[in-house]
Swiss-Prot record:
It is found in: Cell inner membrane. One of its GO terms (molecular function) is protein transmembrane transporter activity. Pfam families: TatA_B_E (PF02416). Coiled coil: none annotated. Part of the twin-arginine translocation (Tat) system that transports large folded proteins containing a characteristic twin-arginine motif in their signal peptide across membranes. TatA could form the protein-conducting channel of the Tat system. GO terms for cellular component: TAT protein transport complex. Keywords: Cell inner membrane, Cell membrane, Membrane, Protein transport, Translocation, Transmembrane, Transmembrane helix, Transport. The chain crosses the membrane at residues 1-21. This is Sec-independent protein translocase protein TatA. Its main location: membrane. One of its GO terms (biological process) is protein transport by the Tat complex.
């Protein structure tokens, strides 16, 4: 996993717990999960662009 061993992962998790605290960790995790879910949803949606020319009835020509 990205060239990280178990020691590095545990060290990163320890630093995260020190920064955010144990009580805020569930909030941070759920917010991160929602952000990832929204990103996946937005990237998987097909982007359809309407390229048909619009007929402008009030056109001065």
């Amino acid at each position: 996993m990205f060239g990280l061993g178990i020691t590095e992962i545990l060290l990163i998790l320890g630093i995260i717990i020190l920064i955010f605290g144990a009580k805020k960790l569930p909030e941070v995790g759920s917010g991160l999960g929602r952000a990832i879910q929204n990103f996946k949803k937005a990237s998987s949606e097909s982007e359809e662009i309407d390229v048909t020319p619009s007929k402008d009835k009030n056109k001065d020509a």
